[in-house]
Amino acid sequence: MDLGDLNKVWEIKALKKKPASDEAQKTLEKIAKQVQPIMKKHRWRVKVLSEFCPNNPALLGLNVGGGVNVKLRLRKANRDQDFIPYNQVLDTMLHELCHNAHGPHNASFYKLWDDIRKVYI
């Protein structure tokens, strides 16, 4: 077995009770596919990539357990029909993936995020 195949998103879950859940699912799938080369290079894994709509409108993403669950906001706060632009969600995903290597927002974290953004955004 090629161990590189393990470094990916394993499961994707959009919020089914929200409007346009099929569009949300496709967005998450596209993001997972786009970041797979990064994940393979850095040996990062995400068990579940899911959509969330937190009460805090400034919260765009969350990485729980070093990649056990990465949650992304796909919709604008209190506007379920309005999706956040794809590149912004992709940037949030890159940010959350960097937490697989560095928990806190320190200089090492921001350097890694900046380096990845230069290549993939």
Where are these regions (language model features)?
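Active-site-proximal or metal-binding-adjacent scaffold patches in catalytic folds
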Residues: 1-90, 100-121
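Walker B catalytic acidic pair
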Residues: 96
